[in-house]
Amino acid sequence: GQLLKKHPAIAVLEPVNEPGYWWFEKWQEKNPNGTRDGFEKWSYENTRDYLNRMVKLFREEGAMQPVVWNCGWEGLIEKNRAAFRGIAASDVDAISFCLYPGQRDLKKPFWENPEELSHKNYLPYVQAVSEAEERLGWLRSEAFKDKAKLVYEFETFCNQSGYIYPAMAAFYREVGAQIATQWTYGLTGYAEYLGGSHVFNLKTTPKKAASFMVAKQQFKDVDTIYSFESRSSGVFHEGTLIYSGEIEMTVPSRPQSIIGVGHSAFVNYGGTGLYFIEPCENGALHLTLMPDTQFIRPHWKELHTGEPVVRLDDEAQHDFELKLPALGKRWIYRREGPRWVPVTASEGAVRFAAQPGEYLIEQEKLMIDRKLLEEGWGH
């Protein structure tokens, strides 16, 4: 087998997820005559020395990846300042943190008291967390300036809105984060049955998925747009337009690719699933319409009963309109199994009754034998 320290896919080493720290009263149980000052000194030195021994062990074992220490969530520094000073003074290469807008709004334990939080505006919260030193503002402090920063869990909380991911990504970049790992993605085979504080999948949560794509560009320091009022976000970069819902934004040139949900200046579509419009050979466009999606049980509740939480509809039919400039005459084909079946032809804007699936929007009528169109390739 392959040793983890030599595995090319392991970029960094974070040995402990969300570690706990000693507090004064707990320390006093073993040090009954100990003072607060004594505890602070011990916490600083014990944390620093423990981390230094850990880094030394990794290096002696030949592991060359950066060593990351997990600093948890907002506000953790308040009761652990001496330990955090020890982290800053240690030999670890990087620190990691997370942010869950809305988690503090729920009664404890949150998994027994979930609520729908999509309707709440968390942009002021993200700003406040960023500015307050005792929350996550310490990430900008002089003590941690030489430590690389990572987000060990990038996710919302009981929230299906399409605006918050890019705002979080902007904050992460402001404090110097170089890596942000998503938590947690529901595998498509089970996504229809998944409920809880973290529900995220390309098919079942289209607005959230599109917003995460926008956030990816924000994390690369590309300007994006987002607002609570629209519950949406968008970005136009290098010819690709992405939006998680209807939002006013300036698009300075004709998009080459479009990923979106709902209506925009270039697409009218009443379906609730994501769509992808991508260029392909001979000036054609490839259109993918994802299934319509609807929550039929509360997505924010921990539902592991085997009953569906989301309904996906592959048969729903909606008018689709593509309004890119200078489209001219176009022929539309739909994939049916191995076949491309003619749907309609249009002049100017492309309009047709569509249902989830794949389409080709061709500049020229496909010169394929009718038998091939009907029977498919290979028959």
Language-model-detected regions and their locations in the chain:
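Short, acidic/polar
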Residues: G1-Q2, G75-A88, S161-A169
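Aromatic-lined carbohydrate-recognition surfaces of secreted/lumenal glycan-active proteins
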Residues: A9-N17, W42-A82, V92-L99, D146-E153, ...
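Substrate-binding cleft of secreted/luminal carbohydrate-active enzymes
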Residues: C158-F236
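C-terminal beta-sandwich/jelly-roll accessory domains of carbohydrate-active enzymes
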Residues: R254-H379
